[in-house]
Amino acid sequence: MSKRSDGSQPRTIVDKVWDAHVVRAETPDAPAILYIDLHLVHEVTSPQAFTVLRERGLKLRRPERTLATMDHSIPTLPRGADGRWPFVDAQAAAQVSQMERNCADFGVELHGLGDDAQGVVHVFGPEMGATQPGMTVVCGDSHTATHGAFGALAFGIGTSEVGHVLASQCLLQRRPRTLAVRVDGELGPGLSAKDLILAIIAKLGVGGGTGHVIEYLGPAVRALSMEGRMTLCNMSIEAGARAGLVAPDDTTFEWLAGRPRAPKGAAWDEAVARWRALPSDDGATYDRELRLDAAALEPMITFGTNPGQGIAVTGLVPDPVAERDASARATLEAALRYMGLVPGKPIAGQKVDVVFIGSCTNGRIEDMREAARVLKGRKVRTRTLVVPGSHRVKKDAEAEGIDRIVREAGAEWREPGCSMCIAMNGDNLQAGQYCVSTSNRNFEGRQGPGGRTLLASPLTAAAAAVTGAVADPRRVLEGR
């Protein structure tokens, strides 16, 4: 590694953000104490942590660095005529009321049901301008890596760690290794960030990023919008990575400017100057590197029961017989057995029962627009739920007429929430049903007991909606 002109060693963005937040250095016997800039909380993983604070007589260490919303267990149907929300069960209603009480008692800013800013936590946080370059961000949710799209070091934590951050604003963490994923070329028509990340996970495998933070680099990544970068980083955990990020640039700054929690005036100029120093230095080294050519990719879809089991929509369902490793062969056999798919058969044409467009992976305005491109002037042939990721997304989409396109196509236009991504809120599959979903996990039963999930982009999901089967969105858009 060559030194920079000032004599210092070149550093990656991960090094820079990590080093700036170490309160106590890591030793062989103890992890580092890492300061946390932003703590996002929701109604499912926070109640126990607040209970611990009460039991121990502790206050919230930094209320101004804690931000709350509701998303997992809330209904995506509107209030009834009686003014009540149609919760799926008493537990869901209790989680919401407990969240309201906890935030009131501890002075946490909450954007709950009925609030114009409420949304899925990883859509809501960036929209508020709370997520900013160079930050450390945590949340009691697996897909916190979404916020890495802004050049933040963002990762999910468990409920006990939620309590640690509430009480101390710090966490015990071991320094992660770094993995550079460089994507050359340009994505072709009909492809998006979702296709790119599914291709990356298929290449790495679901454990390929274990112990690492992924930095996404290259012209194909730079060409992505902020919505696309959030999709990319969101699924880093599905490759086993601790987090994923993209260095900030003008695209980042333009997206953040003017948002509620973003700096204003001279403070904004000072912040941007700091943020411009965050990208990895020339000559910085990574523990590992992976390279892909975006131009070689096709629209992707999963066929199995983990996000690494993905193929092009033009491809064939893999045959376990071709798998040399016995363990991998057994895993593939089990996945195909659960999914009810035939090896060697084209995935295109596979009948679909439900389509879900939404989630923290693909519930943003760009995703709504992409789905509307396919739905416009067509009719769905299967049940289709379109769920905006936040009230802001919903409002913007309705201003553009996207809700009318969705309804005229025969699809359902819902209220913001996690919805069918996690199936704990009344939106779920029945046993044996196939769903093309824009969410992030296709585990057994993820969308309901016995449900079969095929992960795809909004374009591919919408193509499945109007054809009733897995289809190449490029052909649908071309009218073929």
Swiss-Prot record:
It is an enzyme of class 4 (lyase). Pathway: Amino-acid biosynthesis; L-leucine biosynthesis; L-leucine from 3-methyl-2-oxobutanoate: step 2/4. It catalyses: (2R,3S)-3-isopropylmalate = (2S)-2-isopropylmalate. Binds 1 [4Fe-4S] cluster per subunit. Gene3D superfamilies: Aconitase, domain 3. Heterodimer of LeuC and LeuD. Belongs to the aconitase/IPM isomerase family. LeuC type 1 subfamily. Its EC number is 4.2.1.33. GO terms for biological process: L-leucine biosynthetic process. SUPFAM superfamilies: Aconitase iron-sulfur domain. [4Fe-4S] cluster binds at residues 360, 418, 421. Its cofactor is [4Fe-4S] cluster. This is 3-isopropylmalate dehydratase large subunit. Keywords: 4Fe-4S, Amino-acid biosynthesis, Branched-chain amino acid biosynthesis, Iron, Iron-sulfur, Leucine biosynthesis, Lyase, Metal-binding. Catalyzes the isomerization between 2-isopropylmalate and 3-isopropylmalate, via the formation of 2-isopropylmaleate. GO terms for molecular function: 3-isopropylmalate dehydratase activity; 4 iron, 4 sulfur cluster binding; metal ion binding. Signal peptide: none annotated. It comes from Anaeromyxobacter dehalogenans (strain 2CP-1 / ATCC BAA-258).
